[in-house]
Each structure stands twice: as structure tokens, then as C-alpha cells.
Amino acid sequence: MEKQKLIKLIDVAAGRKKADLVLKNAKIVDVFQAKILTGDIAISDGYIAGIGGSYQGVVECNYTGKYVAPGFIEAHIHIESSYVSPEEFSRVFIPRGTTTILADPHEIVNVAGLKGLDYMVNAAKNAKMDIRYMMPPCVPATNFETSGADLYADDMEDALKTGEVDGLAELMNFPGVINADDKMIDEILMAKKYGARIDGHAPQVVGKDLNAYIAAGPANDHECSTLEEAEERLARGMYLLLREGSVTQDLRKLLPIVNTANSRRCLLSGDDVQAKTAINKGHLDNSIRICIDEGLNPITAIQMATLNPAEYCGLNDRGAIAPGRRADMVVFESLEDFAVEETYILGEKLSQGNEYLGEVNYYPIDSVESSMHVKDFTREKLQLHLNSDKVRAIGVVPGEVLTTEEHVTVKRDGDGNFVYNDQEDVTKIVVVERHHNTGNVNVNLLSGYGIKAGAIAISIGHDSHNIIATGTNDDDIFMAVNELIKQEGGAVVVKDEKVISRMELKIAGLMCNLPAEKMIAQQDALDEAVHEELGVPDNVNPVMTLSFMPLAVIPKLKITDKGLVDVEKNAFVSNELD
């Protein structure tokens, strides 16, 4: 802060000068003491000068009867999962009360390397939201797949040194950490060299393995899906992120762990939240409503989205309505309904109701636009030869990124090739490498997705984001993949060799360069086509569910362009049962 601005802030706080803006007679949510205060909020140059006593301002607004809480801070999220650019993310999520995010851009960095990070950083400069980034440490996430880039510790040093990133993002390669893999250790030491925070990712890791993982440096985990996992992490000093995303929704399951003794070690997080979800249901505001609905003290829930993440992330200039803090604020009428009415960032009102009030400018996307590099993709590569009728299939678990290992009996033709049986929910699942023209195409089996006709192909396949497709017949799968390549990414739905819906994601094949509303219209049409025409059940999110099938750092079975991975064994396995 400049000297003259600091002097002015002090003068306003002391009542010697008028504030730029005063919110009069507000019900102030005191997140330090978990209570409600009544008084004024005086703001100078975007910062809170004082609260309580009667202040005078150049502009004064009557907030009698209105609650004012700190703006929400998201400690771990992937902008790419919203399917919109950073600028659009800011526009869509601000009306939901989100004012600061710590984003992990490992999706686009896995596709485009450091130029992907550069794009995200520059695009964020156009956003009113404070978008901060963590450095992705797992590019690629594992050695079981082909990514668009490979990053090592030396590649990260400049960004860590200059503060372009706030720390090291989730250490997804937990087997590498536990087994002291050189690449993982070098990256951890690079982060520690600059005193940077390290985020965790350790699904189903327990006991001594968890001790080893935490000893390496990760300070939080958002991958807990059971109370036992949550308790074990809290007992070992980790911060617990209670996740409520578009697909993975663990919040209600984990809330019973939260009590007065540990609540300040608990944070609310979205991880992967589509723009459509934010508009229709909300973001952290929705998580707070769930907490309240489940009986948690409303102020405790607000702490978990404000003060707690501020302290965890080392952002001591925000997270509370208090002197010297950023005037990032949300306004609402009821602690029971908790509907955000207004959002302020640095003292500027940026939303009223669901309407965003600021301007939006966009950074050029040309550096991350052409990302589909596929060669030698033929229909013949979609054949799946099996040496047995008894095989493994990846089992979809609706609402989870975890999968199961299903043992199924399938039909084969005279040459031993898989034949789709419309009486069984088992289809081909295909990954086509799209970064280096390797020609890699891998075919395995999928159970539980529920598709009954046609095919869908997408360019979102966590975390290396190769093309992933599933369908009931090779003709439709082949056409869907080829159409996806032509449109430079997104999603394509085909039935009877006709494209019936598509969603275009031209930014690295991950994000749309259109306004969120236009993207959502495409997404809604695509979801409807998949549910109505292809028969996928309503409890399966068509794109996001499929996109996690290649994520070979979350158990159990996952598919990559190189083969079928048993994550628990940290090894490839065959389609056939041993």
C-alpha cells in the first residue's frame, strides 16, 4: 500500500476524514468470535478502515437489517472444469460471493505446458476476482499416460521465486511421494526452498503411507470421502477441505466430523465446479447452505469459507470484516436461507442479485488454441481383441471420481473381438492421444455409464486430457472422435453416424472462448442429447463423469492412452482376468 493511502486509511479509521464508502448499521459477521455485531463499515481505497462506531462517508448506504460477511475464498479449484475462461469464471462466480480463488491450472498445463500457465496468469489480470495460482507439480500426473508437457523442479523455480504462483498445487502422484520418487522430491524441495505452501491429494491413503505422505510436506487434502479418512488427516495436522463440486460431492458425508474443537482446521472447497452449476446452484454459498441445512452453526460455516482459508493460504489481508483488511464482502438477508444479494471486491460493488455489474475484457487465446495433434487414427484401432470372455471393466460410481473394478462376462465374435450386448451395461471406452501425434489408441471396457446407443467423445480427460470416448458401436465412436478433432476440442455426440449435439472448447480443448451463457446452452443441449438419445441415466453427468475415467491417481481402475491402470497396484493390468 502506498504511504498516502495508508495515512488516509488511518485518518478515516480515526474519524478524521470521511470514508469513500460507509455501509451503515450493518449486521457484521464477526468470524473471529463467531458472533454478530451491529455497526458501520467504513471503506477507504478498497480497504476497511473501521467498523462499529458512527462513520461519515462520501457515499453512505443504509444496510439496516442486512448481514455483511467477508468475501468467500476458494482454497482449491480448477478453473478449467468450469469450461469457461478465467475472465468468464470471475464474472459467473462473483455473484455467488466468491472473491478470491487459489486455482490449480494443471489441466491446461498438462496440455500446453508453461505457455498454458502464462495464458491463465494473463487472462486473470482482466478479472475483478483475485485469481491466484498454484504451480502444478504433477505434469504429467503419472508415467502411465502421454501428456502435452513434462515439468520438472527447475521449470518451476522462476514462478515460485517471483511469486507468480503461491505454492505447489496438489501432489497427485501420491505413490511417487510415498516412495520418494526423485521428481516428486525435487519439486517438494524446490517449493520448500521458497517457503511455499504445498497442497495435498491422497485418496484412500491411510496409516504409515499417510504419515509418509504428510511428512513430505502436503498440508491439506480434499480427497477424503469417509469420516475415518477425515479424522486421520485432522489428527495428523492436515487442513481438511470438504468438497462439494459438480460431480464429487462429499460435504454432507464429512460434515459430522466438524466440531467446535476442529472447525477452524476445516475449509469448504469446490475443486471441480462447472459454470452451469455455479449459476444454477452456487459455489461456496451453496456449500454454506448445505452446512446450515445439516445443522452446522451458520457462522462456523462462514468461517470455513472465509477466515479459515485466508489463514491457511497466508492471505492475512482478507477473510474478515476488520480494519486493514480488503473490503471483499458479501451481503445477505438471512442466516437461514443464505442467499447472496451483493458482492464487493476492494470496496467496489460487483454484483446485485445474480447480475454481474463490472466490465469484462478478454486476453487473446491464440497461444492455446490449436491443441488437437492426432495421426493415424483408424476405425480398425477401435477393435478390442480379448483372449477370454471374463474381463475387467471400469465401474462408474455416480457422484464420485473413484471407480470400481468390475468383473464381467462379455460376448466375442469369431475372431475374439468384443461385441456390444444391449442387455448388459458394458461398452468400449477409448483414449486417443492428442498431443504429440503418437498414434496411441487404447481400448478398454466401461460399466455403469449407462449408454444404450450412439457415442460421445470429449477432449477433457483428467489429467493429461487426451481424447476419451465411449459408445455402443465403432462407427459412431469413430465419427465422434473425428468430429471432435475437426472442431479443436470440446464434446461431440453421435447417433446413427449423425452428429446430434456438440460443445466447442477451443481453449486447449478445455475451455470455451464464448460467454458462459452460450457455452451453457451448448452444454444443456449436449446433456439432453446424451440422456434422451443415448440413454445415459440422469444421475450420471455425461461429460464430467467420463472425463475422470483416465485419472490414474484416484482408485481403482482407470484408462490411459497406454493401457488399463490399477491405481492401487500402481501398475498396468490386462483386460482379461488373470
UniProtKB/Swiss-Prot annotation:
Q: In Gene Ontology terms, what is one molecular function of this protein?
A: adenine deaminase activity
Gene3D superfamilies attached to this UniProt entry:
Metal-dependent hydrolases, Urease, subunit C, domain 1
List, alphabetically, the Pfam families matched. Answer: Adenine_deam_C (PF13382), Amidohydro_1 (PF01979)
Per the UniProt entry, what is one GO biological process?
Answer: adenine catabolic process
Cofactor(s) for this UniProt protein: Mn(2+)
What InterPro entries is this protein classified in?
Answer: Adenine_deam (IPR006679), Adenine_deam_C (IPR026912), Amidohydro-rel (IPR006680), Metal-dep_hydrolase_composite (IPR011059), Metal_Hydrolase (IPR032466)
Q: Where are the transmembrane segments?
A: none
The question of whether Zinc-finger is a record keyword is answered with no
Show the disulfide pairing: none
* Family label: Belongs to the metallo-dependent hydrolases superfamily. Adenine deaminase family.
What protein name applies here?
Adenine deaminase
What species was this sequence derived from?
Ligilactobacillus salivarius (strain UCC118) (Lactobacillus salivarius)
From the UniProt record, report the name of the gene that encodes this protein.
Answer: ade
